[in-house]
Regions:
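Signature of dsDNA virion morphogenesis modules
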Residues: 1-172, 176-188
């Protein structure tokens, strides 16, 4: 009798001899996410698998900086002082999640209790409404191109976090950044 078995084990982050953190966490996922409009109302944006798992989107995360919080779009003129690590691989689909190999060189954010992850990226936002997995959405994100991966206190994706054992951490203040779309819509992100 021929059979197949797939043993599952949770991937844990490891520390190198130098104290760097190596991990392969979920960095984002598909689903409907709330965003606040400039007038305080909420809109709900769909990150559909057809867009999230597009190969050019998955390829765009490789080599991007891991940052301490979100600091706007990161490039060679503003990366010093905010970059704490790097994404070492392209994104890979794992169910509804995107995973990637990362290294964190400056671990002070993590040691201070921040272990959630939040992607910074550009996209085209379409006004499209519908229902996805029982959740209503009003907009759809397309053409996702990653710019950085931020270490934050609480990420929007919920399950995007480092694979660390829980320990007591100190509270830190989160930074908010305001983004304005070409159509004039503004929203805050952490």
């Amino acid at each position: 009798m021929t059979m197949q078995r797939f043993d599952v084990s949770e991937i844990k982050a490891t520390r190198t001899d130098e104290g760097f953190i190596l991990d392969t966490p979920a960095i984002t996922r598909c689903g409907v996410f709330p965003y606040r409009n400039a007038d305080g109302t909420m809109r709900y944006e769909l990150r559909h698998p057809d867009d999230v798992f597009k190969q050019d989107s998955l390829d765009s995360i490789k080599g991007k900086p891991v940052t301490a919080l979100h600091n706007g779009l990161i490039d060679n003129t503003n990366s010093t002082g905010v970059t704490v690590g790097a994404v070492m691989s392209v994104g890979r689909q794992d169910g509804d999640n995107v995973t990637a190999e990362i290294v964190i060189h400056d671990t002070s954010m993590v040691d201070g209790g921040n272990k959630d992850l939040s992607c910074g990226y550009t996209l085209n936002l379409d006004e499209e409404s519908g229902v996805y997995n029982g959740q209503t959405y009003t907009h759809r994100q397309r053409d996702i191109k990653y710019n950085h991966l931020a270490i934050v206190k609480a990420g929007r994706a919920g399950n995007a976090r480092l694979n660390l054992d829980s320990i007591d951490f100190q509270e830190e203040k989160e930074t908010m950044v305001k983004y304005r779309l070409d159509n004039g819509v503004e929203y805050d992100v952490t």
